[in-house]
UniProtKB/Swiss-Prot annotation:
Domain of life of the native organism: Bacteria
Record: residues binding GTP: D19, H20, G21, K22, S23, T24, N136, K137, I138, D139
Record has Cell membrane as a keyword: yes
Protein name (database record): Elongation factor 4
Annotated tr-type G domain residues: 7-189
Biological process terms in GO annotation: positive regulation of translation
Purpose: Required for accurate and efficient protein synthesis under certain stress conditions. May act as a fidelity factor of the translation reaction, by catalyzing a one-codon backward translocation of tRNAs on improperly translocated ribosomes. Back-translocation proceeds from a post-translocation (POST) complex to a pre-translocation (PRE) complex, thus giving elongation factor G a second chance to translocate the tRNAs correctly. Binds to ribosomes in a GTP-dependent manner.
Family classification: Belongs to the TRAFAC class translation factor GTPase superfamily. Classic translation factor GTPase family. LepA subfamily.
EC number, UniProt record: 3.6.5.n1
Taxonomic path: Bacteria, Bacillati, Bacillota, Clostridia, Eubacteriales
Major subcellular site: membrane
Membrane topology: Peripheral membrane protein
Source organism (scientific name): Clostridium botulinum (strain Loch Maree / Type A3)
GO cellular component: plasma membrane
PANTHER family noted in UniProt: TRANSLATION FACTOR GUF1 HOMOLOG, CHLOROPLASTIC (PTHR43512:SF4), TRANSLATION FACTOR GUF1-RELATED (PTHR43512)
Length: 602
């Protein structure tokens, strides 16, 4: 059932590979529809975190309402939902897409289709969205729009003959893109009188309003004073304000089926308004929630410790504040012998981890040490119990382990054909299993591998970029677990295990990794007054050793000539002292040592 009002609404999002000009296109659409005045326009209006502007990436989903007047005089309401393009934030993208009826697929006219173009495009197709291809950056001399159109038709299989050719930077042909949205994206359906059903596609904490939920109303009507219930948590709230974004808040009386807007209901914590949850009326609730909700599952874990132990409480507060805004971040307290008190934090992926670390340092002025990231291993013990291991320190002894499984990802790498050899070599070094390859055109190949997640969480992306001169693109998704022969590699300094440096590695690589780490630590740890043995061990077996020599004073300087026994006495005395020192001395491990562990030998 479609009302007259709904015929003039279009809900769409923009999907693209990183840096193909998604946020810039959003800026031009905002400008072309006169949503903001010239003075208010700022580059990348929708990326409002400093970090987003600096890295030039979109992290949180955003929404904005545009009013577009056609030449025929009809007025359309376009709700644009800007989504992140990075693979870590896939769940953010999928929920934003569920709030739309159509998606603009932005493809760079100079680069063509990249790995994430495909991944995001398939996500959009999974949500049954109408896909409108738009070819961007046609102002560049190296643009090849006709070839890219052909590529879109061949690789993705959607009609691209009349795709608008635009330049988001200069604002060329933006009107064509707006026309394409109005004519190709379907209008929303939904009964305005049915019980309320609204999808939360983003939520964040505002210090004045409490949690602000970005919602797409699928059925029914929501207005101020409505008693609402969140279907997955079952909590009931009263609506304080509903409104729309013009990117800033603009309160309205009500939101009806088909609308996109925000709602506040003095909710205190983002965890209570999970993204993907369904809002309904408390008194007249819908029978079932909207499908597709799944809580965000962290894939990568890392320990975060304050450099100064006294700042533990501050770190805890900072993490709690970030968590209010980021439902995907999880943390729990843990202690390390080497680093004291800290937290084991779970992240969606490496970029997410990087951003959280940077925000802790920037917004909260904290000095932190982070340990090597690790993934979740599943261990079946001999007595049949199953444990999920996120911290290598807690690994049970080998005699108790019956089976150990590690997460495997399906990855697709798109690379120029000249570099296929180098990429295959890299994937094999990382224990990748080759699945298939296909030529996208004469110069580019898509390779599909199954790779253990553990192998890509450190520096796979950097290694891939450096081997292909920055041309390859990469995308991955978790497909499941597979059993593996893994051991725990411990590092001992002065015969003490440094728990924060422990890591889980495949058995056949333990020796090489141990050697490598011992050598790296020897370069990084400063010399002390006594000699320090650095040992790498698997279980009770030492597999590699390096020694940091002691700094010593020349005790023979004052002996000129004279008897050898006198010199020997002084040397023996010095040796005794160093030995005593070694028994009581402790070794300070600098932050660089923890980082060095991550960089594997390429």
């Amino acid at each position: 059932m479609q009302s007259e009002r709904q015929k003039y609404i279009r809900n769409f999002s923009i999907v693209a590979h990183i840096d193909h000009g998604k946020s810039t296109l959003a800026d031009r659409l905002i400008e072309a529809t006169g949503t903001l005045t010239e003075r208010e326009m700022d580059t990348q209006v929708l990326d409002n975190m400093d970090l987003e502007k600096e890295r030039g990436i979109t992290i949180k989903s955003q929404a904005v309402r545009l009013i577009y007047k056609r030449d025929t005089g009809e007025e359309y309401t376009l709700n644009l939902i800007d989504t992140p393009g990075h693979v870590d934030f896939n769940y953010e993208v999928s929920r934003s897409l569920a709030a739309c009826e159509g998606a603009i697929l932005v493809v760079d006219a100079t680069q063509g289709i990249q790995a994430q173009t495909l991944a995001n495009c398939y996500l959009a197709l999974d949500n049954d969205l109408e896909i409108v291809p738009v070819i961007n950056k046609i102002d560049l001399p190296s643009a090849r729009p006709e070839e890219v159109k052909q590529e879109i038709e061949d690789v993705i299989g959607i009609e691209a003959e009349d795709a608008p050719l635009v330049s988001a930077k200069t604002g060329l042909n933006i009107k064509d893109a707006l026309e394409a949205i109005v004519s190709k994206v379907p209008a929303p359906y939904g009964d305005e009188k049915a019980p309320l059903k609204a999808l939360i596609f983003d939520s964040y904490y505002d210090s004045y309003k409490g949690v602000v939920c970005h919602i797409r109303v699928k059925e029914g009507t929501i207005r101020e004073g409505t008693e609402i219930k969140l279907m997955n948590t079952g909590k009931v709230y009263e609506v304080v304000e509903v409104g729309v974004f013009v990117p800033n808040y603009m309160p309205v009386d009500e939101l009806k089926a088909g609308d996109v807007g925000y709602v506040t209901a003095s909710i205190k914590n983002v965890r209570d308004a999970r993204v993907g949850d369904t809002i309904t009326e408390a008194k007249r609730s819908a029978n079932e929630a909207l499908s597709g909700y799944r809580p965000a599952v962290p894939m990568v874990f890392s320990g975060i410790y304050p450099v100064d132990g006294a700042k533990y409480e501050e770190l805890k507060e900072a993490l709690e504040k970030l968590q209010v805004n980021d439902a995907a971040l999880s943390f729990e307290p843990e202690t390390s012998i080497a680093l004291g008190f800290g937290f084991r934090c779970g992240f969606l992926g490496l970029l997410h981890m990087d951003i959280i670390q940077e925000r802790l340092e920037r917004e909260f002025n904290l000095d932190i040490i982070t340990t090597a990231p690790s993934v979740i291993y599943k261990i079946t013990k001999t007595d049949g119990t199953l444990i999920e291991l996120t911290n290598p320190t807690n690994m049970p002894s080998p005699s108790e382990i019956k089976l150990m499984e590690e997460p495997i990802v399906k990855s697709s790498i798109i690379t120029p054909s000249d570099y296929v050899g180098a990429v295959m070599d890299l994937a094999q070094n990382r224990r990748g299993i080759f699945k298939d390859m296909q030529y996208l055109d004469t110069t580019r190949v898509s390779l599909n591998y199954e790779i253990p997640l553990n192998e890509i969480i450190y520096d796979f992306f950097d290694a891939l970029k450096s081997r292909t001169r920055g041309y390859a693109s990469f995308d991955y998704e978790l497909i499941g677990y597979k059993d593996a022969d893994l051991v725990k590699l411990d590092i001992l300094l002065n015969a003490d295990v440094v728990d924060a440096l422990s890591m889980i590695v495949p058995r056949e690589r333990a020796y090489a990794k141990g050697r490598n780490m011992a050598q790296k630590l020897k370069e990084i740890i400063p010399r002390q007054m006594f000699e320090i043995p650095i040992q790498a061990a698997v279980g009770a077996k030492i597999i590699a050793r390096e020694t940091i020599k002691a700094m010593r004073k020349d005790v023979l300087a004052k002996c000129y000539g004279g008897d050898i026994s006198r010199k020997r006495k002084l040397l023996e005395k010095q040796k005794e002292g160093k030995k005593r020192m070694r028994q009581v001395g402790s070794v300070e491990v600098p932050q660089e040592a923890f980082m060095a562990v991550l960089k594997t030998e390429e």
